[in-house]
Amino acid sequence: MTVFRQENVDDYYDTGEELGSGQFAVVKKCREKSTGLQYAAKFIKKRRTKSSRRGVSREDIEREVSILKEIRHPNVITLHEVYENKTDVILILELVAGGELFDFLAEKESLTEEEATEFLKQILSGVYYLHSLQIAHFDLKPENIMLLDRNVPKPRIKIIDFGLAHKIDFGNEFKNIFGTPEFVAPEIVNYEPLGLEADMWSIGVITYILLSGASPFLGDTKQETLANVSAVNYDFEEEFFRNTSTLAKDFIRRLLVKDPKKRMTIQDSLQHPWIKPKDTQQALSRKASAVNMEKFKKFAARKKWKQSVRLISLCQRLSRSFLSRSNMSVARSDDTLDEEDSFVMKAIIHAINDDNVPGLQHLLGSLSSYDVNQPNKHGTPPLLIAAGCGNIQMLQLLIKRGSRIDVQDKGGSNAIYWASRHGHVDTLKFLNENKCPLDVKDKSGETALHVAARYGHADVVQLLCSFGSNPDFQDKEEETPLHCAAWHGYYSVAKALCEVGCNVNIKNREGETPLLTASARGYHDIVECLAEHGADLNASDKDGHIALHLAVRRCQMEVIKTLLGHGSFVDFQDRHGNTPLHVACKDGSAPIVVALCEASCNLDISNKYGRTPLHLAANNGILDVVRYLCLMGANVEALTSDGKTAEDLAKAEQHEHVAGLLARLRKDTHRGLFIQQLRPTQNLQPRIKLKLFGHSGSGKSTLVESLKCGLLRSFFRRRRPRLSSTNSTRFPPSPLAAKPTVSVSINNLYPGCENVSVRSRSMMFEPGLTKGMLEVFVAPSHHLHCSTDDQSTKAIDIQNAYLNGVGDFSVWEFSGNPVYFCCYDYFAANDPTSIHIIVFSLEEPYEIQLNQVIFWLSFLKSLVPVEEPIAFGGKLKNPLRVVLVATHADIMNIPRPAGGEFGYDKDTSLLKEIRNRFGNDLHVSNKLFVLDAGASGSKDIKVLRNHLQEIRSQIVSGCSPMTHLCEKIISTLPSWRKLNGPNQLMSLQQFVYDVQDQLNPLASEDDLRRIAQQLHSTGEINIMQSETVQDVLLLDPRWLCTNVLGKLLSVETPRALHHYRGRYTMEDIQRLVPDSDVEELLQILDAMDICARDLSSGTMVDIPALIKTDSLQRSWADEEDEVMVYGGVRIVPVEHLTPFPCGIFHKVQVNLCRWIHQQSAEGDADIRLWVSGCRIANRGAELLVLLVNHGQGIEVQVRGLETEKIKCCLLLDSVCSTIETVMATTLPGLLTVKHYLSPQQLREHHEPVMVYQPRDFFRAQTLKESSLTNTMGGYKESFSSITCFGCHDVYSQASLGMDIHASDLSLLTRRKLSRLLDPPDPMGKDWCLLAMNLGLPDMVAKHNVNNRASRDFLPSPVHALLQEWTSYPESTVGILISKLRELGRRDAADFLLKASSVFKINLDGNGQEAYASSCNSGTSYNSISSVVSRRDSHAWTPLYDL
């Protein structure tokens, strides 16, 4: 449902005189306070209920507003704003003050056809615009054709009143009967499908009247008029058309055609010779012909007085009928009165509904003998209708005219009842003051208090009770008003009735109290209120059920908690002897069973059939409930009335799993042991994980060995020999001896990264695709990631170790070789109870040290998803604990005082930089540990040990204590690993089954999930979770992380077929990991995005991480491509221009391989991979995906034939969606954005290529431009050519930059805004002032946290503010940026300029859609496909056929 502005319109506009009114709308002149400009305010009365006939339905109002928002034309009225209050929707419209066109023309002495056509052209122009948008007005008539200003030389026409207008969907048939009889088309009268043609008929009628002063189809009655229309019964009478030209008659004749298909269209009308003469003779003929002004003036006058004359005539006839009533026969009297009363009553009711007091007063003044107490055909007198509408002036008028205050409708309801039903407090006060009876019952026994309670009017209930209304009256079903409130869930009403002292324990005909009713229907707040006001919690209905029974039966958990909290008797038995626990066990609701047992219910009560709750659960085969009852001590040997145990019942119903469980629990000693195993012990968790990250050669392995050394062992420990730099790539040459700014370790990460600066640099110009970062590859063998070192860590080395002076750890050492990085996302940041050590070498220059640390911290940060709801300041509840360690302090001769610690002069600046970037995302220790990793007995190592021990103690104290079952599982795991054979993977469901089957049958799935999480925390197992891998347990992490991945991805593995392209057969994989089930292994590797299986090529497997070749073409040849279109994007991180975490591009390549394998069933698609890119060919379109800018961006370039723009759009969008999905799932904490490449430079193969950033588009939009300047080429490029290859069909359905709805802002973007704007600003430039600027002052009081003690984990007020504000359709990114700038928060505005999407396809052609962003940025494939599917000029090939 569309939400309009909820502010009080009077705060923004001064309302003046009434300009006009209709059945359900009043138009008043108004002035905008801020600008002084005048507008017209149209107050549309809303329909309160769907069944009501008073007011306009919400759907009709929204349709009118939607159409008005869409149209902008000089000859059509313009919508300014829309407000809404409780009763009305207020449209602020352009003020059209010139009056009706026909009134203006009637004042003229003469009028030629040429002059008339000038006005008609304006009408046609407006209708042409509407029809071009597929909008049909359906109510074109003289009253709706106005002049903007009649006092100018050439008045401008405005078409108004779009209440009946519809957007025509040619795919769906539309029929309706509406409009003014004189002007409706035959298809409306005949209830045939309607379209734009209906407006053309109306234009024909208007033209006929304009030229002649006569109406072509007007009859004496409405039925005669409609009959004339249907028969097209008209002619050009000489009296009226003697001076009319032949062309004018031909124009009318072509419009008044019964068959809509043969009727002139708006385009035909504009080209008709009468409107657009083809030669001089036609023009002169038009100028010589004249409008019949005599008749036209009479028509205008007749129209003005027509309604008044009819009313007077009818009123006179009515008066005469009253005077002669006594002289008429009964039958005659009834007939006449029925007919005439129907008319008068309709007029009265219309006046009441329209709040037209003067009109009703005038009407009743003309009907001096009319009895205003007589009811309408539904049995309702006018006074009651007026009471329902709430107009006190109307009531005063009716009472003055003789209405009885105690009049009733045919159902026995009086005015108090009607006013109460509709919630009119002031009306009730008026009626009470005028002695209207208060507690009158209608035919169903209901009073006004009943109906007020049923409709939820708490203020009315309070008022009626204050008048003295009896709150305990019962209707014919013996229900009180409190029953009504409890049934419908109106808490405020129930509270009001309780506070006035009503009897809360009255029962209805079914024996239900209000408490029973509220409990059954789940209204826990009402249950709470009733309990606090003395409701009997154990009152029962006719079946002996108390409230707790009914709540359990309906699974109303909140109600159950409330009843138990107030002391409801948990063991109450109904007439069948069933307690609430019996009901819960029969229905199988485990959470409710748990709640009842925690309330100390009796587990072994038998019902009338001798069955306990355990019998019912076993009989129904509900294993979880049976297990829990047994755990809580239920008697498994209890017998039913016919001598059967629960086990017997389970066997009889063939519930073998339940019977087996009960059989194992026959002996109490066994059950006691099982129960004891599940209880927490005093033992703390024995071990947590210690994870080490760092580049190759940073000293991770050496540091681990040193930490393991005890004092005595450290004296005898021999330092590992340092190999010569000329013989080993693990220890690169000293930076002083080689290039001063080049780090081999950073080269291991990305070729060319030696030039990466820690500060953000411009991405405006980039090196060519065949130069720069890829020049480092002379031959595959020269790539450092192919080097071999027997001492280097393979994949992830895992060992359980005791670190001397610290404690037990599961140590996970992550290799610094980039070939392994594609598997780290599943293991690096999946446990907040781990300690993460980032190790870097002081041998590197400071800039490289900082880059290395930032790289690993960015990796960890990117792996942590956004938590919802976003906390105050965007903080995380459990940030990862990180320790920074700098090694090789001895080699670099870092100064150290005698017996002291190393003193690194850059530690303060490094820590400051790290905290600025990662302080909100990671818990980084305040100290940088500078040490010699091999000196196990040094003070520096000791200080590090103390710090690790302190962190370990904090983490372990927050972990759950161990249970005997967890310890038992740990001792059993080795045998399970051995039994599991070649693969150590197990589903959680299988794990639960095995534990229950072999170790403890009473352990529930929830128990075992907690234990599995604890085992995961200790490093015994690893729980693998992602969108593709869910609840998979890795029983032996070493098997996968060290053995399988270490062998599969290692550069030491034997060469296999196509190894240079990373392409293997199943047999190759089997040879690499001979001890594994290759089929199952590939399934998990495929799910981890390490490989992609190509089923279309037999049993081939792509593993991009193993690709060695870099000799493939990485750009398009410099050839003549005059008929080709080019385009592309670059996906980059938003906040810091750092390399993407390594391994992500391998995953992108895997997903593109998988995508192409799915597309190429017929062999039409092809993909070629190399180290830092891939090339895709797909039926006339080609695509390059490249890792560029030293790993800081992923570039997607597309080219295709000029005639295949749609294919290019689809291909680019699909690949970008694939990449963004990989980013969002693999690195959920990384915010990315798309930059756009210059299509002209791509076409010219010009390097470097211009890169357009979001702020470039926003700046151009602000300047009202639709193109961007390529400063390199010296020319401009249009938005459409940059974003969608110049494809008009796609571009026309898109929103651009500032016009994109703000709800598309991702969670990561919102979290960043929370960090910027949540903290109080000394100058007040924070979220509070932003809320005021956005027109949401109520949010300030609602979310103000200044008075609260702690802000650590309060919800973010900025997030709440954006959620509220983005629910409005006019909330765009551009408005938000402008509001932030007005606030003085340029930092937040600049961030949005960097992070916002540039181009978004709108699914809804009318404008807004249900906004839901599923990616970090960009458009979705589905949206562009939907645009393509609506094109009916070509049959586009689906993407999978491209």
Swiss-Prot record:
Residues 267-334 are annotated as: Calmodulin-binding. One of its GO terms (molecular function) is identical protein binding. It comes from the Eukaryota. Residues 13-275 form the Protein kinase domain. PROSITE patterns: ANK_REP_REGION, ANK_REPEAT, DEATH_DOMAIN, PROTEIN_KINASE_ATP, PROTEIN_KINASE_DOM, PROTEIN_KINASE_ST, ROC. The keyword Magnesium does not apply. Gene3D superfamilies: Ankyrin repeat-containing domain, Death Domain, Fas, Phosphorylase Kinase, domain 1, Single helix bin, Transferase(Phosphotransferase) domain 1. Pfam families: Ank (PF00023), Ank_2 (PF12796), Death (PF00531), Pkinase (PF00069). The active site is at D139 (proton acceptor). Ubiquitinated by the BCR(KLHL20) E3 ubiquitin ligase complex, leading to its degradation by the proteasome. Activated by Ca(2+)/calmodulin. Regulated by a locking mechanism, involving autophosphorylation at Ser-308 and calmodulin binding. In the inactive state, Ser-308 is phosphorylated. Activation involves its dephosphorylation and a release-of-autoinhibition mechanism where binding of calmodulin induces a conformational change that relieves the steric block of the active site by the autoinhibitory domain. Activity is modulated by UNC5B and NTN1. UNC5B activates it by inhibiting the phosphorylation at Ser-308, whereas NTN1 inhibits UNC5B-mediated activation of DAPK1. Residues 292-301 are annotated as: Autoinhibitory domain. It catalyses: L-seryl-[protein] + ATP = O-phospho-L-seryl-[protein] + ADP + H(+); L-threonyl-[protein] + ATP = O-phospho-L-threonyl-[protein] + ADP + H(+). Its EC number is 2.7.11.1. Its cofactor is Mg(2+). ANK repeats lie at residues 378-407, 411-440, 444-473, 477-506, 510-539, 543-572, 576-605, 609-638, 875-904, 1164-1196. GO terms for cellular component: actin cytoskeleton; cytoplasm; cytosol; DAPK1-calmodulin complex; glutamatergic synapse; plasma membrane; postsynaptic density. This is Death-associated protein kinase 1. It comes from Mus musculus. The gene is Dapk1.
